Regions:
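Flexible, low-complexity junctional segments that flank or bridge functional domains
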Residues: 16-293, 297-327, 372, 409, ...
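Surface-exposed, short loops/turns at beta-strand junctions within beta-sandwich domains
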Residues: 2-6, 202-205
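Conserved acidic, small-residue-rich alpha-beta core segments centered on
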Residues: 18-19, 305-459
């Protein structure tokens, strides 16, 4: 019975009287899953040694290969492992967790899976003493930066930042793409938008920031110098935000003169509540003789896909389904990390397209909507909202207007959480692959609109089409 980390010294004596000193020592059967105490021991200052950083990268590579259903669907295997070796060789003698993230995150990004990523260690970097750029920015899909807020309102909200310390906005954004997982650049820019402050500090922290900007709808360039501050100093000096009314998951308005209703659809939550909402909305449209319905999905990040099925029953001209196929990989590592002991190791492939289990639409008597339907989508239409947009077009439910959706027709998903053993860096890894109904992995893309316009102009385009 050798205890974990145990070490036992004793003398072995043969029946002839010969003896030998013998040591029995506990060694992990798989050190990448169960490292030794010595490997996990950090320095007093919290730094990782080069050996520990290399170990964390090896553990990351091992776990990715044990969990992900198709690591190399985008990146060539040989090129990826060359990158792994290069990063391990480039590591300095010691690193912080943030520095390890800077080295390792691009390796995960290369896999091209928007759900598989290394997460920035915000709590390790941003402390009460951290000084930071006192400027908050929105990153746009056209590679521009718009001001969300600035200390003392030195740069007004919605002004366009052209450069910071001589680095133009496009250059800043492009340099951060290595840290943004995703299948499309616009999807990755959305990731950068969420993490911009952290990535900027990691890559471009300075003693002062010379910012060149211009006001909205102006070509005149203006300049200001900002100095880094702590969060405690920054917060009371930020412009006060206007109180915003809570946005409902779904709501609708009727324009009786134009005979048009607009459904503002923000989130796929609560199928039961959706059913009550849909009943009420379609009764209203029927009573008022509204023959055109615009469903606005431009700022919908997804949720429960059953919500989509509820709405589809009112608008689909024929039986429908959202999901086509799914591939699931389960390994002992998957089971260990999820804690789902009921899982059985192996591969499972589900082909719903070969089955006849389509969902029937409502009959006219049950409340089916007989008018024209227009769907507005954007690069921000993700997850279940992306699936909704795909099925809407695939089953001919109406006209799609806007930008390619952020959610792809073939994608990896259903993530597990994994922490690198020494640094504690957090990672999400997909263990399933999904195909929307009728999708082909040879042509991976989001839902393509029938009328491609910038998302800001999608509603106006819908009204224009209705007027015709």
């Amino acid at each position: 019975n050798v205890a974990k980390e145990g070490c036992y010294d004793f003398v072995v004596v043969t029946h002839q009287g010969d003896s030998a000193m013998t040591r029995i020592k506990w060694v992990s059967a798989n050190p990448l899953e169960e490292p030794s105490r010595d490997m996990l021991k950090r320095s007093a200052g919290g730094l990782l040694s080069k050996k520990q950083a290399q170990f964390d990268i090896d553990a990351l590579v091992y776990t990715l290969s044990e969990v992900h259903p198709d690591m190399f669907s985008v990146c060539r295997q040989s090129e990826w492992f060359k990158s792994v070796n290069r990063v391990k060789q480039q590591l300095p003698d010691s690193v912080t967790t943030v520095e390890l993230f800077k080295y390792a995150a691009p390796l995960v990004t290369k896999l091209g899976d928007g759900h598989t990523m290394l997460r920035f260690p915000f709590n390790d970097y941003f402390t009460s003493s951290t000084i930071r750029l006192p400027l908050f920015l929105n990153v746009k899909s056209d590679y521009t930066l718009r001001v969300r807020g600035c200390i003392d309102n030195l740069i007004p909200q919605d002004a366009e930042v052209l450069s910071i310390n001589g680095k133009e906005s496009r250059e800043l954004i492009e340099s951060m793409m290595d840290y943004a997982s995703g299948e499309r650049d616009f999807f990755r820019i959305e990731r950068i938008n969420s993490d911009f402050s952290a990535l900027f500090e990691m890559m471009y922290a300075a003693d002062k920031y010379d910012v060149v900007y211009r006001m909205k709808d102006s070509k005149k360039k203006l300049e200001v110098t900002l100095h880094p501050t702590t969060w405690a100093e920054l917060l009371p000096r930020m412009p006060k935000k206007k109180e915003q009314a809570r946005v409902l998951d779904y709501s609708f308005k009727v324009d009786e003169k134009k005979k048009v209703a607009v459904m503002d659809f923000r989130s796929f939550n609560n199928p039961q509540r959706t059913k009550m909402f849909a009943d009420s909305m379609f009764v209203t449209l029927r009573e008022k003789g509204i023959k055109n319905l615009i469903i606005d999905l431009r700022n919908n990040g997804g949720g429960n896909s059953m919500v989509g099925d509820v709405l589809f029953r009112y608008i689909s001209p024929k039986p429908f389904k959202q999901m086509g196929k799914a591939l699931v990989r389960v390994t002992p590592t998957t089971i260990r990390l999820t804690g789902r002991t009921q899982m059985v190791p192996g591969w499972s492939f589900y082909n719903d397209e070969s089955k006849g289990n389509f969902i029937p639409p409502l009959t006219k008597e049950e409340g089916h909507y007989e008018g024209s339907v227009y769907l507005l989508i954007s690069h921000h239409t993700f997850s279940s909202a992306g699936s909704f947009a795909w099925a809407f077009k695939e089953f001919g439910m109406g006209t799609v207007i806007g930008e390619e959706s952020g959610g792809m027709n073939v994608s990896f998903g259903d993530i597990i959480y994994y922490k690198l053993p020494v640094s504690g860096l957090s990672c999400t890894i997909s263990f399933k692959r999904f195909w929307q109904y009728g999708a082909d992995e040879k042509e991976i893309h989001g839902t393509l609109p029938d009328y491609a316009v910038p998302q800001e102009g999608a509603l106006a385009k819908a009204f224009q089409l209705i007027k015709k």
